[in-house]
Amino acid sequence: MLTPQRSAWSLKSKVSSEKPRSKGKGITKNLDSAATPFPPLGLLNGGDLDRGGEDMEAWKRFKDEGLLDESICYKKDRESLASRIIELEKDLHEYQYNMGLLLIEKKEWSSHFEEMKMRLAEAEEILKREQAAHIIALTESEKREDNLRKALGVEKQCVTDLEKALREMRSEIAEVKYTAEKKMTEAFALEASIEEKRLDTERKLHSADAKLAEASRKSSEINRKLEDVEDRERKVQRELNSINSERKALEKDISEQKEHLREWEKKLQDGQNRLLDGQRHINEREERINEAEGGLKKKEEELEEAKRSIEGTRNTLKRKEEDLDVRLRSLVSKEKEIELKMKNLQKKEKDLHEIAEKLDHREREEIQKLLDEHRATLDTKKREFELELESKRKSVDEELKSKFAAVNKAEKEVNRKQGLISEGEKELESKMDKIKIKEKDLETKSKALKKWEESLKSDEKKLVAEKDQIMKDTHELKVSINELESLRDALNAEQHQIAEEREKLEISKEEREQYIQKQSELKQEIEKYRNMQEELSKGIESLREEREKFEKEWESLDEKKITLQRETKKIHEEKEKLEKWHHKDQERLRNEEANAKADIERQLEDIKLQKEAFENTMKHERLMAQEEVARRLADVTRELELRKHDLEMNMQKKQEEIERKLQGKEREFETRKEAELSRITSLINLNNSKLQKLRIEQDRLDREKEEVELQKKKLQEDQSEIQRDVDTLRQLSKNLKNQRAEFIKEKECFLAAAERCKTCQNCGVSISELEMVGIIQSSAEIENADIVLPSLTDDHIEQHMKNKGSHVTSPQTGSRVFGSGFLQKCTKIFKFSPGKNAETSATTTPLVFGEELDIAASEDAAANDNNPAADVERVTVNPSLVFGEQLDTAASEDAAANDNNPAADVERVTVNPPPLAPVATEQNETEESSLPPENDSPPKQRGGRQSTRRGRGGKTVRRTRTMEAVVDDAKAILGDTLIVEEAKESSQQNDEQSQGASVHTGGTSNTRQKRRRAPASEMTNSEHDVEESESQSQSISIGRGRRKKRQTSAASEVQAPVVERRYNLRHSTVAKNSVAATLAVSDQAKVQTKASHQASHDNNQISMGDDPALEGSHKVTHTVQKTTTASVMEVSSKPAMEETHEENIVVRSVEISEMSASEEAEGEVQGVPPIAEEPATPSSGSSTSGDIGNDDDMDDDDEEERHNASIGKKLWNFFTT
């Protein structure tokens, strides 16, 4: 079958190409073939073989003697090599020709197979026709039997029943087929989906690797941007979140894929179970069919017995039987042919099954490997995502291990092949020279082989798909064969039934009744049978369609097989040259041996056809062919050895390079991993530290917020209390306005008394008319003045709260709070003596009574705030000409009581001026007069001073008011504009509570208090504004000393107007403009006369220096007795807790800012009235302790209170009731 016809070959070429091969070496062989003449053609016809042998021997001798030239031999060698190459090319063409023949034979076999299919189809059609004819015959016989004895009706029913049963069976079989096909398609679809999912998983893994690379890149960028800590933390958190989310998403995808795979495996198992169940159902149905056939056989026996009774129908039945016998014989002959064809088909199917089983086995192994690999990769990826960098190292190790395993396997295969190849090493050593020449050709062929291998890989994938299709086709063929066998069995059964029915027709008359009874059953069975036949016909049609499809697919498969066979043959040829590539070289050698044998057989056949004489020559040719095969094998083995050696070297080099690269990558990976881990740990530590700091700050802020809320609550309460106080003040002002008439009346009485007592009873000094004029003017101004209601402004409160802060008063200062101080100062204002009414009216500027109340209330409110502003008291002294002789105590006390400025109550003031710079401008002077908050004396000194005044506590109503209540009242009136700096209170509270104000009454060393100069740079604008406003306000001296002063009318006329001052919680907007508005031209003239009068007395008095900085530098304390300059004494103090006296003496550092007599002309200070200091005698002011509240002062106070009982008690009773 496989021997091609080679008519184109000539005997001459064979003899010429093979005859010289009997020599040992290829070169001599070629030289012999080229140099020696060919034997004559006559030898072929005759038997002169000996002559040819003699000629050969002669040529050999000639050659051995060395008569040939070397150049000719070299040329002949080259020609022989070229001829050898040509011969090899011819061999290749021959091999290709053989491949073409094989393909042609394959086509022939495929055509033969198609013919067999066509024959089968024709046989099936004949069978169908015969079945139809048989059914027609049966119907005809039934009709005749109905016409004769109505017996054939029962047979028809039986046939219909049988047909129905068959139809049901066929329908069930078709359904089972359809379900099986669906399941197979689903299985293939699932396989495709699994592959797609695998690809998706690989893509996702690549994307995950890319994302990991991106994460590393981002981490590097984060390490570069170490400047902004917050941005770095956010980026790190975002990256961590993204990585976690990606990891979770990948884990979810992997879990879903695992679930899909598990579901797919479950579905496959379910499909297999269903197929098994379907097969079981088919087997059960076949058993049922067999049982039905047994029942039918019984019924047929009964029918035969009934037929025996029918004698009239025997002849017709015999004729029909003969016809049926003839047809059955033809069917049997056709069935035998079909069986032969089926056997052939079965053989081919077995071959296909074997191939399919091999392919299935390989596919299963590959699929299992793929599944194992995928599972391993999935597990490794999980671990990688969970363990991050550590898992990467493990995965790299696993990959390296797998690669090393693959390399080891390849090495084992190479070693195995080396063992096989080492056997032919001895034979291949002799042909090294030829192989060197062929190395170039082999290199080109190796490149082609690589290309072929790549094409083979793609073809193998195609083969896998085609194998699947072949498996499907084989399965369908099996099903169709089984159906044909079942049809054949059914036909045999039907034949047996017909024969039995014929026998049963000969039943005796006794059994006719039973036959009639069973005819109905037989009719039903016949109907079933007809149904079965219809189903069979449908199944046959479906089988035809399937056969057509199968034929089409088979044709496509044949075409693919042809192409694949071509490619496989080419692959086999190349594999025969190289055993390393899956034993391709061994197959090539086998094909060459087979080709050599085929050539020998062809030659033998040609020689046998031509002559028997060529048997000897054919034997010789066979020997030559064997030698050629051996030589070729030796050449191939030599080539294989060289190629193997080269490949081994290349593999070793590649392995070394791969190992080096892997080691370098591992080192880089470890270094990067360590660097990233260190960076991540550093970032984590930084983040943790920052988080801890942020938590601490957050806790601190929460605490501060709580404190602020508490302070806000306190402030609200203080605002409410302030509002209440304001309401009370307004009510008091209204009451005072109503009582002004009474006061005017009393004042008129006082003026009348003053006119009577123009001369002092104690000292005999007469009161000048100028002082009386001042008293009259002051009384007129008081009558004409309107009482202005106290009011609050937002600006003052805001500035006050910003500069001073809101502090709770200490327990020591709690007794002297807002209500008590205010009432005391009100009593001081309204204590007028009849003797001094005219002097006060002449010396003081027109001051509204309500404004004095506001001033007193503001000072008490400032004292209640427990801030430095509460400890600053301004002692304003009305300037007057002090005479050498002192008035008596009663007259001086009355004059002090009638004075509107309560600062005149200070008897002796010890001044310790601050070390301030000289006054240059109005602004500098106002700045020098102000003090920072931290320069005040502690509140303990005030407590000591208050303890000396408790003797008069019964005559005053003291209201305990806290700073919180005052602030709450102010906030309730002003709204939420009050800004309280609560954060500064905790740091300033202890310092500010320890601050107080004290007055130095003596220049001795008992005070022992250092004077600290506050630099001008420490003073803020807010402090300057507050102290400037306080310098304009009139505060009342706390210490009640001896009031032994005499004020002349000239001095009172020269006095500048007192700045109007409202409640201390706001700035006074009228203060700066009130001086210019209240001064008259006549007053200015009087001021000039006063200045000249004061200049004459400056030599006799120890007065304050105009340069406060000079006085502060020397720290000289002056006892002021007489002065003619207007000055404003600002009382302030610095905290000097370590230098306070042990006797708890109240010390007030008085800061005096002086103005010269030329103040009116120059206008350096606006809003500050020039006030003369009080004269003090040495006998009354020689105490060095500076304590104002001593026993002498208390006695003088008691005398004053008894003397002023006529007016003071009334006013006091008015304010206290």
UniProtKB/Swiss-Prot annotation:
**Primary location class:** nucleus
Question: What residue spans carry the Polar residues bias annotation?
Answer: 1-14, 986-1007, 1087-1103
Task: Write out the biased-composition intervals (Acidic residues).
Answer: 1189-1200
Per UniProt, subcellular location reads as:
Nucleus matrix; Nucleus lamina
The UniProt annotation puts the region (Disordered) at 1-45, 892-969, 981-1057, 1087-1117, 1152-1217
Q: Where is the composition biased (Low complexity)?
A: 892-904, 1173-1186
GO (cellular component) term, any one: nuclear matrix
Q: Which residues form a coiled coil?
A: 159-746
Per the UniProt entry, the signal peptide is none
Query: In the UniProt record, does the keyword Nucleus occur?
Result: yes
Q: Which UniProt keywords apply?
A: Coiled coil, Nucleus
Its GO biological process annotations read: nuclear matrix organization
Q: Which InterPro entries match?
A: CRWN
Q: Which portions of the chain have biased composition (kind: Basic residues)?
A: 947-960
Task: Outline what the protein does.
Answer: Architectural component of nuclear structure that plays different roles in controlling nuclear size and morphology. Involved in the organization of multimeric complexes in the peripheral nucleoskeleton.
> Can you tell me which family this protein belongs to?
Belongs to the CRWN family.
Tell me what this protein is called: Nuclear matrix constituent protein 1
